[in-house]
Swiss-Prot record:
A Pfam family recorded for this sequence: Agouti
Residues covered by the Agouti domain: 93-132
Gene: ASIP
Region (Disordered): 62-85
Function: Involved in the regulation of melanogenesis. The binding of ASP to MC1R precludes alpha-MSH initiated signaling and thus blocks production of cAMP, leading to a down-regulation of eumelanogenesis (brown/black pigment) and thus increasing synthesis of pheomelanin (yellow/red pigment).
Name of protein: Agouti-signaling protein
Disulfide bond keyword on record: yes
Length: 132
């Protein structure tokens, strides 16, 4: 009995390792520089060289001004957002955190929705988004 459990446990560990290993991307193992040149489909000389250029004071000032303009425009845009008007409450509705099984009317809060759990046996109105 213990031998069969040990065998099954070993088999389970092997299968877990095999599935995890099969989902990993294959690693390229190149032995030397010659195989790198022969196996490489992209020649490194095809890419242009990178040149590093120092910025002068004028270009730094211009880039700072552009960054400040972007920051101020983002602040103005965030201040311009206005909360949308809420719809008037209808009389037959379900309050937040109360039961709202499907034959019941909709939730009173426009940001709330009816969420059911346990195969639609326990349903309640819940607010999902705080920014609504």
């Amino acid at each position: 009995m213990d031998v069969t459990r040990l065998l099954l446990a070993t088999l389970l560990v092997f299968l877990c390792f095999f599935t995890a290993d099969s989902h990993l991307p294959p690693e390229e193992k190149l032995r030397d520089d010659r195989s790198l040149r022969s196996n490489s489909s992209v020649n490194l000389l095809d890419f242009p060289s990178v040149s590093i250029v120092a910025l002068n004071k004028k270009s730094k000032q211009i880039s700072r001004k552009e960054a400040e303009k972007k920051r101020s425009s983002k602040k103005e845009a965030s201040m311009k957002t206005v909360a949308r008007p809420r719809t008037p409450l209808s009389a037959p509705c379900v309050a937040t955190r109360n039961s709202c099984k499907p034959p019941a009317p909709a939730c009173c809060d426009p940001c709330a929705s009816c969420q059911c759990r346990f195969f639609r046996s326990a349903c309640s109105c819940r607010v999902l988004s705080l920014n609504c």
